[in-house]
Swiss-Prot record:
Lineage: Bacteria, Pseudomonadati, Pseudomonadota, Gammaproteobacteria, Vibrionales
GO process annotations (BP): defense response to virus
Organism, as annotated: Vibrio cholerae serotype O1 biovar El Tor
Family annotation (InterPro entries): HNH78-like (IPR013467), HNH_nuc (IPR003615)
Function according to Swiss-Prot or TrEMBL: Putative HNH endonuclease component of antiviral defense system retron Vc95, composed of a non-coding RNA (ncRNA), a reverse transcriptase (RT), a probable ATP-binding protein and this protein. Expression of retron Vc95 confers protection against bacteriophages T2, T4 and T6. At multiplicity of infection (MOI) of 0.02 cultures slow growth when infected with T4 but do not collapse, at MOI 2 cultures enter growth stasis.
CDD domains, alphabetized: HNHc
Record key words, sorted: Antiviral defense, Endonuclease, Hydrolase, Nuclease
Protein name: Retron Vc95 putative HNH endonuclease
Top-level taxonomic group: Bacteria
Length: 205
């Protein structure tokens, strides 16, 4: 998960909200006149996130991403007051195949117990050498369940993600074993250059 620190709200989004005023509703998020603003928001976040999905940390083109409400705008957990709040936005991946859908598509209108807006979000996870993400740092059974629910809600251990992480870990271990000098520098460079750059730092061996 990317620990997301938002920059300034795009001017276009601020202007749209001001223009609509009291008439603004969550339906406007899908309205034709908001799509240009949404594209600006998506492009900005895509760059901010280093072209990675906020949840699975895989790299995607901007057209393979959607603007995600971290706290849902509709449904039983709706927080419509945050529908046009920039700090409630992230971009997450889009999968056409329903079997491989993860992240925002799988989360839908549910509430995450661990959100990417927390700087310490990844401290709740550990990554094993098989590529599985597991709960960590929990104080009791309830907290462990909350962490596991977040992992499951986002589908972070779906086979295709787990296998891709495993391959990346194997490459990292190879570098560690093959390198005698500048090991820290080389492993840092490897982690920063690819997918899973944050969760890889939670690897336990």
């Amino acid at each position: 998960m990317i620990p997301l620190s938002h920059n300034n709200t795009p001017t276009e989004l601020e202007n749209y909200v001001k223009l609509k005023g009291q008439s603004l509703t969550i339906q406007d998020f899908s309205a034709h006149d908001f799509q240009g603003v949404k594209k600006i928001v998506r492009d900005r976040l895509h760059t901010l996130q280093g072209e990675l999905c906020v949840y699975c940390e895989k790299k995607y083109s901007v057209d393979e991403m959607q603007v995600e409400h971290i706290k849902p705008k509709s449904g039983r957990n709706a927080q419509p007051n945050l529908c046009f709040t920039y700090s409630n936005y992230a971009v997450s991946c889009i999968q056409e195949n329903r079997k491989t859908q993860t992240c925002g598509q799988k989360k839908k209108d549910n509430i995450l117990f661990i959100e990417p807006t927390s700087p310490s979000c990844n401290s709740h996870f550990s990554l094993d050498t098989d590529g599985f993400i597991n709960p960590r740092g929990f104080k009791n059974r309830k907290e462990k369940h909350s962490i596991q629910t977040t992992i499951d809600m986002l589908g972070l251990n779906k086979p295709h993600l787990q296998l891709e992480r495993k391959k990346q870990i194997e490459r990292l271990i190879y570098i560690l074993k093959a390198t005698k000098h500048n090991r820290h520098e080389l492993t840092n460079k490897f982690i920063k250059s690819g997918n899973f750059k944050y969760i890889l730092r939670e690897l336990t061996m």
